[in-house]
Amino acid sequence: MLHLIIAEAELELVPESIRDHPAVVNYARRRKKRPEEAILDSTYHHAALKKLPDGDRRGRPDIVHICLLNALESIANKEGFLRVYVHTRNDEVIHIKPETRLPRNYNRFLGLMESLFKKGAVPEGLELLRIEKKPLESLIEDINPDTVFIMHEEGELIRPRSFGEILASHQNPVVVVGGFPHGDFMRPIEGTKVSLYREPLMAWTVVSEVIVNFEAALGL
Protein backbone atom coordinates (compact mmCIF):
# COMPACT_ATOMS: atom_id res chain seq x y z
CA MET A 1 0.00 0.00 0.00
CA LEU A 2 1.40 3.36 -1.06
CA HIS A 3 0.57 6.24 1.29
CA LEU A 4 0.71 9.64 -0.40
CA ILE A 5 0.78 12.73 1.82
CA ILE A 6 0.30 16.23 0.39
CA ALA A 7 2.20 17.98 3.19
CA GLU A 8 2.18 21.56 4.47
CA ALA A 9 -0.57 22.21 1.94
CA GLU A 10 -1.55 25.85 1.58
CA LEU A 11 -5.17 25.09 2.40
CA GLU A 12 -6.67 27.15 5.22
CA LEU A 13 -9.54 29.39 6.19
CA VAL A 14 -8.96 33.14 5.98
CA PRO A 15 -6.77 34.06 8.99
CA GLU A 16 -8.26 36.39 11.58
CA SER A 17 -5.69 39.12 10.94
CA ILE A 18 -7.01 39.83 7.41
CA ARG A 19 -10.72 39.08 7.75
CA ASP A 20 -11.56 42.78 7.62
CA HIS A 21 -9.49 43.41 4.49
CA PRO A 22 -11.67 44.72 1.62
CA ALA A 23 -10.55 41.93 -0.72
CA VAL A 24 -11.70 39.34 1.82
CA VAL A 25 -14.91 41.10 2.82
CA ASN A 26 -16.02 41.66 -0.78
CA TYR A 27 -15.21 38.08 -1.76
CA ALA A 28 -17.13 36.67 1.20
CA ARG A 29 -20.11 38.91 0.46
CA ARG A 30 -20.24 37.72 -3.15
CA ARG A 31 -20.28 34.13 -1.98
CA LYS A 32 -22.76 34.85 0.82
CA LYS A 33 -20.37 33.68 3.51
CA ARG A 34 -18.76 35.21 6.55
CA PRO A 35 -15.04 35.99 6.01
CA GLU A 36 -14.01 33.40 8.61
CA GLU A 37 -15.86 30.68 6.68
CA ALA A 38 -14.03 31.26 3.38
CA ILE A 39 -10.99 29.36 2.15
CA LEU A 40 -7.96 31.60 1.60
CA ASP A 41 -7.27 31.85 -2.13
CA SER A 42 -4.50 33.92 -3.69
CA THR A 43 -6.58 34.42 -6.84
CA TYR A 44 -9.12 36.47 -4.91
CA HIS A 45 -7.17 37.58 -1.83
CA HIS A 46 -3.88 38.63 -3.40
CA ALA A 47 -3.89 42.12 -1.88
CA ALA A 48 -4.69 40.77 1.59
CA LEU A 49 -1.98 38.11 1.38
CA LYS A 50 0.67 40.83 1.32
CA LYS A 51 -0.12 41.42 4.99
CA LEU A 52 0.51 37.81 6.00
CA PRO A 53 3.78 36.07 6.86
CA ASP A 54 4.72 33.79 3.94
CA GLY A 55 1.98 35.53 1.96
CA ASP A 56 3.72 34.75 -1.32
CA ARG A 57 3.11 31.00 -0.87
CA ARG A 58 -0.23 30.90 0.96
CA GLY A 59 -3.74 30.61 -0.38
CA ARG A 60 -3.17 27.81 -2.90
CA PRO A 61 -6.07 25.35 -2.56
CA ASP A 62 -5.79 24.77 -6.31
CA ILE A 63 -2.63 22.73 -5.72
CA VAL A 64 -4.52 20.39 -3.39
CA HIS A 65 -7.42 20.16 -5.83
CA ILE A 66 -5.29 19.11 -8.80
CA CYS A 67 -3.15 16.71 -6.77
CA LEU A 68 -6.21 14.99 -5.32
CA LEU A 69 -7.95 14.69 -8.68
CA ASN A 70 -4.85 13.02 -10.12
CA ALA A 71 -4.45 10.67 -7.16
CA LEU A 72 -8.06 9.67 -6.55
CA GLU A 73 -8.75 8.98 -10.24
CA SER A 74 -5.61 6.86 -10.60
CA ILE A 75 -5.63 3.14 -11.34
CA ALA A 76 -3.63 2.53 -8.15
CA ASN A 77 -6.42 4.08 -6.09
CA LYS A 78 -9.19 2.28 -7.97
CA GLU A 79 -7.37 -1.04 -7.44
CA GLY A 80 -6.86 -0.46 -3.71
CA PHE A 81 -3.11 0.19 -3.69
CA LEU A 82 -3.19 3.86 -2.64
CA ARG A 83 -4.18 5.97 0.36
CA VAL A 84 -4.11 9.76 0.14
CA TYR A 85 -3.91 12.34 2.92
CA VAL A 86 -3.64 16.13 3.07
CA HIS A 87 -1.62 17.77 5.83
CA THR A 88 -2.02 21.55 6.06
CA ARG A 89 0.32 24.35 7.12
CA ASN A 90 -1.73 24.62 10.33
CA ASP A 91 -1.20 20.96 11.26
CA GLU A 92 -4.57 19.62 10.25
CA VAL A 93 -4.88 16.27 8.51
CA ILE A 94 -7.60 15.46 6.01
CA HIS A 95 -8.35 11.74 5.73
CA ILE A 96 -9.84 10.78 2.38
CA LYS A 97 -11.63 7.53 1.66
CA PRO A 98 -10.50 5.89 -1.60
CA GLU A 99 -14.02 5.91 -3.06
CA THR A 100 -14.23 9.71 -2.78
CA ARG A 101 -15.04 11.50 -6.03
CA LEU A 102 -14.10 15.15 -5.74
CA PRO A 103 -15.84 17.91 -7.70
CA ARG A 104 -13.99 18.66 -10.93
CA ASN A 105 -15.20 22.24 -10.74
CA TYR A 106 -12.79 24.34 -8.67
CA ASN A 107 -15.44 26.55 -7.06
CA ARG A 108 -17.41 23.50 -5.98
CA PHE A 109 -14.21 22.08 -4.51
CA LEU A 110 -13.73 25.29 -2.50
CA GLY A 111 -17.27 24.95 -1.20
CA LEU A 112 -16.61 21.35 -0.19
CA MET A 113 -13.45 22.34 1.69
CA GLU A 114 -15.29 25.15 3.47
CA SER A 115 -17.95 22.67 4.59
CA LEU A 116 -15.24 20.27 5.74
CA PHE A 117 -13.52 22.91 7.88
CA LYS A 118 -16.87 23.93 9.35
CA LYS A 119 -18.36 20.49 10.03
CA GLY A 120 -15.27 18.32 10.52
CA ALA A 121 -16.49 15.64 8.10
CA VAL A 122 -18.41 15.56 4.81
CA PRO A 123 -20.80 14.48 3.48
CA GLU A 124 -23.02 13.84 6.48
CA GLY A 125 -23.44 10.14 7.11
CA LEU A 126 -20.71 9.01 4.72
CA GLU A 127 -17.75 11.04 6.01
CA LEU A 128 -15.72 10.53 2.84
CA LEU A 129 -13.49 13.36 4.02
CA ARG A 130 -12.62 13.96 7.67
CA ILE A 131 -10.36 16.62 9.17
CA GLU A 132 -8.59 16.56 12.52
CA LYS A 133 -5.87 18.48 14.28
CA LYS A 134 -2.68 16.45 13.90
CA PRO A 135 0.97 17.18 13.05
CA LEU A 136 2.65 15.46 10.13
CA GLU A 137 4.90 13.42 12.41
CA SER A 138 1.89 11.90 14.16
CA LEU A 139 0.21 11.02 10.86
CA ILE A 140 3.33 9.21 9.67
CA GLU A 141 3.58 7.43 13.02
CA ASP A 142 -0.05 6.28 12.69
CA ILE A 143 0.62 4.90 9.20
CA ASN A 144 3.65 3.01 10.56
CA PRO A 145 5.49 2.86 7.21
CA ASP A 146 8.50 0.71 6.39
CA THR A 147 10.10 3.71 4.64
CA VAL A 148 9.48 7.42 4.08
CA PHE A 149 10.44 9.34 0.94
CA ILE A 150 10.30 13.14 0.75
CA MET A 151 10.04 14.53 -2.74
CA HIS A 152 12.55 17.37 -2.81
CA GLU A 153 14.37 19.24 -5.56
CA GLU A 154 17.65 18.78 -3.66
CA GLY A 155 17.11 15.07 -3.08
CA GLU A 156 18.89 12.15 -4.71
CA LEU A 157 18.10 12.16 -8.43
CA ILE A 158 16.30 8.93 -9.31
CA ARG A 159 14.61 8.14 -12.62
CA PRO A 160 10.83 7.98 -12.19
CA ARG A 161 10.66 4.39 -13.45
CA SER A 162 13.33 3.28 -10.98
CA PHE A 163 11.58 5.10 -8.15
CA GLY A 164 8.35 3.30 -8.97
CA GLU A 165 10.18 -0.02 -8.67
CA ILE A 166 11.64 1.05 -5.32
CA LEU A 167 8.18 1.91 -4.01
CA ALA A 168 6.75 -1.38 -5.23
CA SER A 169 9.48 -3.27 -3.37
CA HIS A 170 8.18 -1.96 -0.03
CA GLN A 171 5.09 -3.10 1.83
CA ASN A 172 3.94 0.21 3.30
CA PRO A 173 5.88 3.19 1.90
CA VAL A 174 5.05 6.84 2.54
CA VAL A 175 5.71 9.50 -0.10
CA VAL A 176 5.56 13.13 1.04
CA VAL A 177 4.89 15.81 -1.59
CA GLY A 178 4.90 19.50 -0.69
CA GLY A 179 1.52 21.13 -1.22
CA PHE A 180 2.94 24.63 -1.70
CA PRO A 181 3.98 26.55 -4.85
CA HIS A 182 7.67 27.10 -4.12
CA GLY A 183 10.29 27.06 -1.39
CA ASP A 184 11.03 24.36 1.15
CA PHE A 185 9.19 22.57 3.91
CA MET A 186 8.86 24.78 6.97
CA ARG A 187 9.92 21.99 9.33
CA PRO A 188 12.31 19.08 8.90
CA ILE A 189 10.83 15.70 7.98
CA GLU A 190 12.61 12.44 8.69
CA GLY A 191 13.07 10.34 5.58
CA THR A 192 14.97 9.97 2.32
CA LYS A 193 14.89 12.97 -0.01
CA VAL A 194 14.27 12.08 -3.65
CA SER A 195 14.15 14.15 -6.84
CA LEU A 196 12.64 12.84 -10.08
CA TYR A 197 14.00 15.51 -12.40
CA ARG A 198 16.91 17.92 -12.68
CA GLU A 199 14.57 20.91 -12.42
CA PRO A 200 11.78 21.73 -9.93
CA LEU A 201 8.39 20.20 -10.75
CA MET A 202 4.91 21.26 -9.72
CA ALA A 203 3.35 19.18 -6.96
CA TRP A 204 0.69 17.66 -9.22
CA THR A 205 3.35 16.57 -11.72
CA VAL A 206 5.28 14.83 -8.95
CA VAL A 207 2.09 13.13 -7.76
CA SER A 208 1.35 11.87 -11.28
CA GLU A 209 4.90 10.62 -11.88
CA VAL A 210 5.02 8.82 -8.54
CA ILE A 211 1.68 7.08 -9.00
CA VAL A 212 2.05 6.17 -12.69
CA ASN A 213 5.49 4.63 -12.17
CA PHE A 214 4.33 2.82 -9.03
CA GLU A 215 1.48 1.36 -11.09
CA ALA A 216 3.89 0.30 -13.84
CA ALA A 217 6.12 -1.47 -11.33
CA LEU A 218 3.09 -3.34 -9.97
CA GLY A 219 2.01 -4.28 -13.49
CA LEU A 220 -1.31 -2.49 -13.21
Curated annotation (Swiss-Prot):
<feature type="site" description="Interaction with substrate rRNA">
    <location>
        <position position="101"/>
    </location>
</feature>
<keyword id="KW-0694">RNA-binding</keyword>
<keyword id="KW-0949">S-adenosyl-L-methionine</keyword>
<dbReference type="InterPro" id="IPR023503">
    <property type="entry name" value="Ribosome_NEP1_arc"/>
</dbReference>
<dbReference type="InterPro" id="IPR029026">
    <property type="entry name" value="tRNA_m1G_MTases_N"/>
</dbReference>
<feature type="binding site">
    <location>
        <position position="178"/>
    </location>
    <ligand>
        <name>S-adenosyl-L-methionine</name>
    </ligand>
</feature>
<keyword id="KW-0808">Transferase</keyword>
<keyword id="KW-0698">rRNA processing</keyword>
<feature type="binding site">
    <location>
        <position position="183"/>
    </location>
    <ligand>
        <name>S-adenosyl-L-methionine</name>
    </ligand>
</feature>
<comment type="similarity">
    <text>Belongs to the class IV-like SAM-binding methyltransferase superfamily. RNA methyltransferase NEP1 family.</text>
</comment>
<protein>
    <recommendedName>
        <fullName>Ribosomal RNA small subunit methyltransferase Nep1</fullName>
        <ecNumber>2.1.1.-</ecNumber>
    </recommendedName>
</protein>
<dbReference type="GO" id="GO:0019843">
    <property type="term" value="F:rRNA binding"/>
</dbReference>
<feature type="binding site">
    <location>
        <begin position="196"/>
        <end position="201"/>
    </location>
    <ligand>
        <name>S-adenosyl-L-methionine</name>
    </ligand>
</feature>
<dbReference type="GO" id="GO:0070037">
    <property type="term" value="F:rRNA (pseudouridine) methyltransferase activity"/>
</dbReference>
<feature type="site" description="Stabilizes Arg-60">
    <location>
        <position position="62"/>
    </location>
</feature>
<feature type="site" description="Interaction with substrate rRNA">
    <location>
        <position position="60"/>
    </location>
</feature>
<dbReference type="Pfam" id="PF03587">
    <property type="entry name" value="EMG1"/>
</dbReference>
<dbReference type="InterPro" id="IPR005304">
    <property type="entry name" value="Rbsml_bgen_MeTrfase_EMG1/NEP1"/>
</dbReference>
<dbReference type="GO" id="GO:0070475">
    <property type="term" value="P:rRNA base methylation"/>
</dbReference>
<keyword id="KW-0489">Methyltransferase</keyword>
<keyword id="KW-0690">Ribosome biogenesis</keyword>
<comment type="subunit">
    <text>Homodimer.</text>
</comment>
<dbReference type="InterPro" id="IPR029028">
    <property type="entry name" value="Alpha/beta_knot_MTases"/>
</dbReference>
<comment type="function">
    <text>Methyltransferase involved in ribosomal biogenesis. Specifically catalyzes the N1-methylation of the pseudouridine corresponding to position 914 in M.jannaschii 16S rRNA.</text>
</comment>
<feature type="site" description="Interaction with substrate rRNA">
    <location>
        <position position="104"/>
    </location>
</feature>
<keyword id="KW-0699">rRNA-binding</keyword>
<feature type="site" description="Interaction with substrate rRNA">
    <location>
        <position position="108"/>
    </location>
</feature>
